[in-house]
Amino acid sequence: MAKEKFDRSKEHANIGTIGHVDHGKTTLTAAIATVLAKNGDSVAQSYDMIDNAPEEKERGITINTSHIEYTTDKRHYAHVDCPGHADYVKNMITGAAQMDGAILVVSAADGPMPQTREHILLSRNVGVPALVVFLNKVDMVDDEELLELVEMEVRDLLSEYDFPGDDVPVISGSALKALEGDADYEQKILDLMQAVDDFIPTPERDSDKPFMMPVEDVFSITGRGTVATGRVERGQIKVGEEIEIIGMQEESSKTTVTGVEMFRKLLDYAEAGDNIGALLRGVSRDDVQRGQVLAAPGTITPHTKFKADVYVLSKDEGGRHTPFFTNYRPQFYFRTTDVTGVVNLPEGTEMVMPGDNVEMDVELISPIAIEDGTRFSIREGGRTVGSGVVTVINE
């Protein structure tokens, strides 16, 4: 079977379904694919295909996720659905599936539940830009006023976590009825996707963001200067542009990129995704090291103290066998390097067990270029014991 060509004419976005267990996330995922398939835009997916999610390994963490794709008039979507609550937590913290937006599924019969709140908080912490709400199972609720009440509750909850609760589209429907082919409820799925098209912003492409490249290796070329190699994480760099070298020391230094090489060929510029060598003017071999980043001046700064959301690997995932406490000192692995840091647990949290997710304060022994949303692993003795994302920078 010949591979279909990926259609680039439509913009692409990654989305997912989030919400409390059994509120209908997977049924909704199946309904979206099925209803859009009727409109000739997608391949129908059965509930079973989505629910039997294969295990994936992301940084050694076992996550069950289902990926399906579908298209609307406006966009091509990659949609991720996770069967279990733990899978969501891991997925969002590790960034295994980056989401440009999400559909929050709330059962109209039950209203918001603990995981509803937790998924909204996680979405806020890991930087999901926008949420759209699907009030599911409305066929099971006869009372109009009850529906309005649930909608108000959901909006309040979103506002509590800094999402625009008053403006978020809330679509009421029944994923199951839509799957069964009920035309009125199929229309609700189309309404939902229209809301997703309109309300979830067009993702900014990595190449449009400010330039940043984590340094993987450094060497000097006699007569030409120092070359830093790595993969451009975001943005573009043109020959002759000024950059900053950030991290591992208090002071950042500025220099000019006098050459960009890829596969031994000289380029005028490089962009996100390219593996390059950047020739740096007037920089000695000792001024640059692995673990630093090259970045557009003023766009990212070095820090040692931050708050983070962390998932701690379970014993089965190759993590620790025992809990850890405040003052735990593991290595924090950012992009290309390990830095020792001290963990401070929140008040009321005595210890953290393998398999938990926790908010913690971290202080690193040397500054690293970080910002809200920067991801890292926690390692000890070379093995990964946790995965986290920076939520607040303290200093």
Curated annotation (Swiss-Prot):
What PROSITE patterns is this protein classified in? Answer: G_TR_1, G_TR_2
Q: Give the record's subunit note.
A: Monomer.
Q: Report the domain of life of the source organism.
A: Bacteria
Q: Where does Mg(2+) bind?
A: 26
tr-type G domain location is: 10-204
Name listed for the protein in its UniProt record = Elongation factor Tu
- The Enzyme Commission number assigned here is 3.6.5.3
Q: What class of enzyme is it?
A: hydrolase
Chain segments carrying region G5: 174-176
Function recorded in the entry: GTP hydrolase that promotes the GTP-dependent binding of aminoacyl-tRNA to the A-site of ribosomes during protein biosynthesis.
Q: Where is this region: G2?
A: 60-64
Indicate the principal place this protein occupies in or around the cell.
Answer: cytoplasm
UniProt region (G1), positions on chain: 19-26
Source organism: Staphylococcus saprophyticus subsp. saprophyticus (strain ATCC 15305 / DSM 20229 / NCIMB 8711 / NCTC 7292 / S-41)
- The yes or no answer to whether the keyword Cell membrane is present is no
